[in-house]
């Protein structure tokens, strides 16, 4: 009798702990369920040019900066997420496309020096420009006062989409009168790189101005654009590569009246502008 009574007392004392553990497991299952994705959400993006996450170009993460493009022959997705789950901000304003949810890197193509000042974060990391995204987020700082004073000239050669690239960037830095100006010009040209029937012609520009009134207030204006025309390549079957005796075969091009023509020519120009008022809050006042 005493043994049964003692066992009943022990069970009665352990019931709250067992109930709490069961409730914790249930909450854990509910939390995990909120992070489940359907197959359609994780499908591959048909547009290969947009498969790179905004985080790939992050220069403050050793791993991400080494698995990005960097003239590499392959692409990378952070944790396998589609690029629509990564957010790109410019001066604190989100620039993901409203229809596709993805950021078009053609919007800032050829402006490598002007867009070099950026901050990248992982999924839901603490930051000062967004609530976060499951694929991470990046913010490009185009404020003219944040560029170092001076000029830079860049000349590059390649045998891929374009053959030659030239960029020139000049910045006054923050002057004594509180003004700062930055400008950048770029041009990329290619007349058939390593793939036949591919041409590339792109001009890019950036102009930024900022007026710093005091330590707490400043007004910034930035405008940029990249008018581009590019001939595209289309995927082909292994049989087509075998018959052409080349893995660089492009079915999009051919001759018409003795001149080369391409069936898919993309002409893109999305001029953009951003105006921002920067207010540094003083917690002591």
Language-model-derived ranges and their functions:
Residues 152, 157-190, 194-233, 265, ...:
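Transmembrane beta-barrel wall of Gram-negative outer-membrane proteins
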Residues 16, 84, 147, 175-177, ...:
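Short coil turns and loop connectors of transmembrane beta-barrels in diderm outer membranes
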Residues 115-120, 135-137, 142-157, 181-185:
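Transmembrane beta-strand segments of Gram-negative outer membrane beta-barrel proteins
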Residues 59, 120-122, 150-154, 188-192, ...:
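Extracytoplasmic loops and strand-loop junctions of Gram-negative outer membrane beta-barrel proteins
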Residues 195, 220-258:
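Outer-membrane beta-barrel and related beta-rich outer-membrane complex signature
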């Amino acid at each position: 009798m005493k043994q049964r009574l003692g066992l009943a007392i022990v069970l009665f004392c352990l019931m709250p702990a067992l109930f709490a553990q069961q409730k914790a497991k249930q909450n854990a299952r509910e939390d995990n369920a909120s992070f489940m994705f359907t197959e359609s959400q994780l499908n591959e993006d048909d547009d290969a040019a947009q498969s790179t996450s905004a985080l790939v170009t992050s220069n403050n993460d050793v791993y991400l900066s080494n698995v990005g493009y960097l003239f590499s022959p392959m692409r990378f997705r952070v944790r396998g997420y589609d690029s629509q789950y990564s957010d790109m901000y410019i001066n604190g304003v989100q620039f993901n496309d409203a229809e596709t949810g993805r950021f078009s890197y053609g919007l800032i193509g050829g402006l490598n020096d002007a867009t070099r000042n950026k901050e990248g974060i992982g999924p839901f990391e603490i930051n000062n420009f967004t609530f976060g995204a499951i694929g991470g987020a990046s913010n490009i700082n185009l404020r003219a006062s944040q560029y170092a004073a001076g000029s830079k000239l860049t000349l590059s050669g390649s045998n891929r989409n374009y053959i030659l690239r030239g960029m020139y960037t000049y910045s006054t830095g923050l002057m004594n009168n509180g003004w700062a100006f930055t400008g950048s010009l770029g041009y990329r040209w290619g007349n058939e790189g390593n793939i036949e029937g591919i041409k590339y012609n792109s001009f890019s520009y950036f102009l930024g101005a900022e007026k710093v009134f005091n330590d707490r207030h400043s007004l910034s204006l930035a405008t940029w654009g990249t008018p581009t025309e590019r001939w595209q390549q289309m995927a082909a079957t292994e049989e087509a590569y075998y018959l052409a005796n080349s893995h660089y075969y492009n079915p999009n091009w051919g001759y018409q009246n003795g001149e080369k023509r391409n069936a898919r020519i993309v002409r893109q120009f999305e001029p953009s502008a951003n105006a921002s008022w920067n207010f540094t809050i003083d917690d002591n006042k």
